[in-house]
C-alpha cells in the first residue's frame, strides 16, 4: 500500500471517529442543556438572588420567629406524614404485588390519584371530608380531635399528596424479588417475620429510602392543598411554602427568596445525604 493510500485511510478513520463521536455526544449535550435550563439554572438564580442579601438581611429574615415557626411546622408535619406513608406504603405495595383480589386494578390505579388531581382540588376535598361536619371529621370531633384547620390537617394533606411515591418506588423492586428465596427460607424453618427481615427487607431498603425521601421532599414543598386545609395562622399551622406565598402577596420578594432558599437548602442537604447513604449501602452489598 502506498503512502498516499495510507494517509487517505487515516483521514477516513479520523473522519469516521469524529462523526461517531458527534453522533454519540449530541444526546449527552441535549440532556445537559435540558437539565441546566430546567433544573440547575433556576436554583442558581435563587441562590444568587439570596446571596445579594447575605450580608444585609439574610440571617435576620431567615431567623425571624415566624419563619422559624414555619420551618418547625413544615418539617415536623412532613416527617410525620413520611413515617405514615413509609409504613403503609410498604404494606400496600406488598399486597398489590403479591396478592390477587377483586378490584385490584382499580385500587392500583387509585394510587396515582394524587398525581392527577390538582392540589387545590385535593385541599378542598380534604377540608370538606375532615371538617367538623365532614364524613370523617365529625368522628374525630366526637372524641375531641380537630383535623381540618390544624397541624393534623396539614399532615393529612401531606400524606395524601406524597403517598404514591413510596408505593410506586417499591412495586418494581418487589416484582423482581425471587419468591423461591422465601420458600427456601421457610423450608429451612424460618418464620414469616424472620424471612421478611432477613430475605425480603435488605433488597427493599434502597427502594424504601428512595421512596421515603421523595415523599418527604414532596411534603415539604406542598402548598396547594395545605393552604386550603390549614388555618394558616402564624405559630399554629402556617407552613413555609404558604409563608413564601404570603410574602410574595405583600411584594416582599427579598423575604420570600430568603425563606425559599432555606427550604431549598434543607431539601438539597437531605437529597445529598440520602444519596450518600445509598452509595455506602451499594459498597457494602458489593
Curated annotation (Swiss-Prot):
Keywords of the record, alphabetical order, are: Chloroplast, Membrane, Plastid, Sulfate transport, Transmembrane, Transmembrane helix, Transport
Membrane-topology descriptor: Multi-pass membrane protein
Instruction: Tell me which InterPro entries the record gives.
Output: CysT_permease (IPR011865), MetI-like (IPR000515), MetI-like_sf (IPR035906), Sulph_transpt2 (IPR005667)
Is Plastid one of the keywords UniProt gives this record? yes
Which cellular compartments is it found in?
Answer: Plastid, Chloroplast membrane
UniProt keyword annotation of Lipoprotein present: no
Instruction: List the GO terms this entry assigns under cellular component, sorted alphabetically.
Output: chloroplast membrane; plasma membrane
Q: Which GO terms describe its molecular function?
A: ABC-type sulfate transporter activity
Q: What parts of the sequence cross the membrane?
A: 27-47, 77-97, 106-126, 147-167, 196-216, 225-245, 257-277
- The ABC transmembrane type-1 domain sits at 71-272
Q: What is the stated purpose of this protein? A: Part of the ABC transporter complex cysAWTP (TC 3.A.1.6.1) involved in sulfate/thiosulfate import. Probably responsible for the translocation of the substrate across the membrane.
Instruction: Give the similarity note.
Output: Belongs to the binding-protein-dependent transport system permease family. CysTW subfamily.
Q: Which PANTHER family match?
A: SULFATE TRANSPORT SYSTEM PERMEASE PROTEIN, SULFATE TRANSPORT SYSTEM PERMEASE PROTEIN CYST
Q: What is this protein called?
A: Probable sulfate transport system permease protein cysT
What is the scientific name of the source organism? Answer: Chlorokybus atmophyticus (Soil alga)
Amino acid at each position: 500500500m502506498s503512502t498516499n493510500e495510507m494517509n487517505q485511510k487515516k483521514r477516513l478513520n479520523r473522519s469516521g471517529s469524529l462523526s461517531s463521536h458527534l453522533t454519540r455526544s449530541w444526546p449527552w449535550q441535549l440532556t445537559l442543556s435540558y437539565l441546566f435550563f430546567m433544573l440547575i439554572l433556576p436554583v442558581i438564580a435563587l441562590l444568587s438572588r439570596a446571596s445579594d442579601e447575605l450580608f444585609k438581611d439574610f440571617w435576620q429574615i431567615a431567623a425571624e420567629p415566624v419563619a422559624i415557626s414555619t420551618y418547625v411546622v413544615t418539617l415536623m408535619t412532613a416527617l410525620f406524614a413520611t413515617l405514615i406513608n413509609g409504613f403503609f406504603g410498604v404494606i400496600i405495595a406488598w399486597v398489590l404485588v403479591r396478592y390477587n383480589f377483586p378490584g385490584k386494578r382499580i385500587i392500583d390505579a387509585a394510587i396515582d390519584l394524587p398525581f392527577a388531581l390538582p392540589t387545590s382540588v385535593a385541599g378542598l376535598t380534604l377540608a370538606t371530608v375532615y371538617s367538623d361536619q365532614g364524613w370523617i371529621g365529625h368522628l374525630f370531633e366526637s372524641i375531641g380531635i380537630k383535623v381540618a384547620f390544624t397541624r393534623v390537617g396539614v399532615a393529612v394533606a401531606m400524606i395524601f399528596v406524597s403517598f404514591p411515591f413510596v408505593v410506586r418506588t417499591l412495586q418494581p423492586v418487589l416484582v423482581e424479588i425471587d419468591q423461591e428465596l422465601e420458600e427456601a427460607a421457610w423450608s429451612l424453618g424460618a418464620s414469616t417475620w424472620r424471612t421478611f427481615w432477613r430475605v425480603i427487607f435488605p433488597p427493599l431498603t434502597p427502594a424504601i429510602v428512595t421512596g421515603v425521601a421523595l415523599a418527604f421532599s414532596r411534603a415539604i414543598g406542598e402548598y396547594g392543598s395545605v393552604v386550603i386545609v390549614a388555618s394558616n395562622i402564624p405559630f399554629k399551622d402556617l407552613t413555609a411554602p404558604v409563608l413564601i406565598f404570603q410574602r410574595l402577596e405583600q411584594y416582599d420578594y427579598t423575604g420570600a427568596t430568603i425563606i425559599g432558599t432555606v427550604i431549598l437548602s434543607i431539601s438539597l442537604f437531605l437529597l445529598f445525604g440520602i444519596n450518600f447513604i445509598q452509595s455506602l449501602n451499594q459498597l457494602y452489598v458489593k
